[in-house]
Amino acid sequence: MLADSVVTNEDYAKRAAELGHSVLSSCEHGNQGNYRECALLAEKYDLHWRYVSEAYFVKDRREKDNTNCHIILAAKTAKGVGDLNFVLSEANISGFYYRPRMDMELLLSLDPKDVFVTTACIAGVFKYGEEEAEKLILRFARHFRDSFMLEVQYHDTEKQREVNQFLLKL
């Protein structure tokens, strides 16, 4: 497993329990390969496991285009887990170009009753510029409604501050 973090899943689970949290999730880019480890850790620390993946989004998964961006997908229900597995598998089958990529067709096949979607980090839709990012965000929001969230993060960098200001204006 290649991680974007300096702490282990065990560290996260233990700390979440210490802080009185009720939910644990961990996401990987393009798949959910560590779900078993995290589900067992959630059980060990008496936390509810949330199935999540940081997917790669592109405008058309069938085009050989490497300008992908990140988007977070989280299951709310057991059906949502199955649906996420399906779209992640389909991204590998019909959208693989360097990475398993999904497009609007796959994303909008997800039922808002069963999944949450967020804009992810600064490597999210903001990579396409403000005008295109706003169009995509509005389309996501229309479909997912209350199951769609803008992800404001605190990283003390100029780029993160710009993204946060853009999100707050929306």
Predicted regions and their residues:
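Phosphodiester-processing cores and adjacent nucleic acid-binding clamps
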Residues: 1-170
